[in-house]
UniProtKB/Swiss-Prot annotation:
<keyword id="KW-0484">Methanogenesis</keyword>
<feature type="domain" description="B12-binding">
    <location>
        <begin position="1"/>
        <end position="59"/>
    </location>
</feature>
<dbReference type="InterPro" id="IPR006158">
    <property type="entry name" value="Cobalamin-bd"/>
</dbReference>
<comment type="function">
    <text>Acts as a methyl group carrier between MtbB and MtbA.</text>
</comment>
<dbReference type="GO" id="GO:0046872">
    <property type="term" value="F:metal ion binding"/>
</dbReference>
<comment type="pathway">
    <text>One-carbon metabolism; methanogenesis from dimethylamine.</text>
</comment>
<comment type="similarity">
    <text>Belongs to the methylamine corrinoid protein family.</text>
</comment>
<dbReference type="InterPro" id="IPR036724">
    <property type="entry name" value="Cobalamin-bd_sf"/>
</dbReference>
<dbReference type="GO" id="GO:0031419">
    <property type="term" value="F:cobalamin binding"/>
</dbReference>
<dbReference type="GO" id="GO:0015948">
    <property type="term" value="P:methanogenesis"/>
</dbReference>
<protein>
    <recommendedName>
        <fullName>Dimethylamine corrinoid protein</fullName>
    </recommendedName>
</protein>
<keyword id="KW-0170">Cobalt</keyword>
């Protein structure tokens, strides 16, 4: 869920892990604007795009 995505980022911040873990969000209700709002590192519209963006994040 969108709230779950936001919660994960908040928990990572609380545990001091946010700068060590990349977060990609997606799914039907998610958008780039949502990813920006919650502080995600990346947004992908679909699985194929997620693979390409994951490779970019890890490069």
């Amino acid at each position: 869920t969108l709230q779950g995505q936001k919660d994960v980022i908040e928990l990572l911040k609380e545990e001091g892990l946010r700068d060590k873990i990349k977060v990609m969000v997606g799914g039907a209700p998610a958008t780039q604007a949502w990813a920006d709002k919650i502080g995600a590192d990346c947004y992908a519209e679909n699985a194929s795009e997620a693979v390409a963006k994951a490779k970019e994040l890890l490069a």
